[in-house]
Design a protein with these regions (language model features):
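Catalytic cores and adjacent binding grooves of peptidoglycan-active enzymes
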Residues: 183-256
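Acidic/histidine-rich, surface-exposed loop or edge segments in extracytoplasmic proteins
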Residues: 106-128, 172-182
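N-terminal secretion targeting segments of exported proteins
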Residues: 1-90
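Second-shell loop/turn segments in exported
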Residues: 122-134, 166, 180-189, 235
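Extended, low-complexity, intrinsically disordered C-terminal regulatory tails
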Residues: 65-106, 130-166, 212, 219-222
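Short glycine-biased active-site loop of nucleotidyltransferases that positions the nucleotide triphosphate
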Residues: 165-172, 238-240
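Secretory-pathway extracellular proteins and peptide precursors enriched for disulfide-bonded cysteines
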Residues: 46-48, 104-109
Length: 256
């Protein structure tokens, strides 16, 4: 109990100190009661005040927290094993996590892994390379090829492209790649989500800005992460809704 007078010759604590201690105790009790979900969601100017896991895997038993290195390792291992190739050592990761990433949500294809967003602010604007992509976008393509092998790609061309996409499309800047999974079937959608999860897990390393697939999008500009509904422009067909392809683009940077 806080002393109401001098104890052992010490002066009485100022009233504001007593009130501050009481408020801290109340705040701590509230956080314990409401759980880690609230603590993980508190942000100050884009930073985590009480940080939760960097990445979250949704399972039937509840959410599983992963750090970014675990998410990168797990998504890479899943992709390589599905190709019948040797995967990196995943001893420190629960086998159930790997199985959940492989199978995806029960019932229908969809997202079950997300990571917090983080967008670098010190990047310089880049010119097109010979492929029609910027160097950052080329790094994404090379990294995908290393893990997923040859894919059906589009949305860029040598010299750049100037039509076929929305007016402000990052495709015109050479910053975007489309990876096709046609026709639109549940199996192809599940394959698309395996790639999408891998991209999100590696987004910080590769300066990825957006991943769009299957009516959903992830953004590096949203610090809390998560997948969000993508509102496709009219006429809202399979292409515009990104049902038949994963769209990934990289951060643009500022003029040097």
């Amino acid at each position: 109990m806080i002393a109401r007078g001098e104890v052992g010759g010490r002066r009485r604590r100022p009233q504001w100190v007593v009130l501050w201690i009481l408020l801290l105790g109340v705040a701590g009790s509230v956080l314990v009661f409401l759980g880690p979900g609230l603590a993980g969601g508190l942000r100050v100017e884009g930073s985590s005040l009480l940080a939760g896991p960097e990445c979250t895997l949704e399972t039937a038993e509840g959410d599983v927290g992963l750090d970014r290195d675990e998410a990168k390792l797990a998504t890479t291992a899943v992709a390589l094993r599905l190709r019948g190739l040797e995967a990196p050592d995943t001893t420190g990761i629960d086998a159930a996590v790997l199985q959940q990433l492989t199978d995806g949500p029960a019932g229908d294809a969809g997202p079950n892994l997300s990571c917090r967003g983080s967008a670098a602010s010190d990047l310089e604007e880049q010119e097109l390379t010979g492929s029609g992509l910027t160097s950052r976008a080329e790094e994404v393509r090379a990294a995908m090829t290393e893990v997923f092998g040859d894919q059906s790609l589009g949305g860029f061309a040598p010299g750049g492209i100037g039509q076929g996409h929305g007016g402000e499309s990052t495709h015109y800047d050479g910053r975007a790649i489309d990876i096709f999974f046609r026709p639109v079937t549940e199996d192809n959608r599940r394959q698309g989500w395996i790639l999408s999860h891998w991209l999100v897990a590696h987004a910080e390393d590769l300066d990825i800005q957006y991943v769009i697939f299957d009516d959903e999008f992830w953004s590096a500009h949203l610090s809390r992460g998560g997948w969000h509904h993508y509102e496709a422009p009219a006429p809202g067909n399979e292409i515009l809704r990104h049902l038949d392809h994963v769209h990934v683009d990289v951060l643009g940077g500022s003029p040097g």
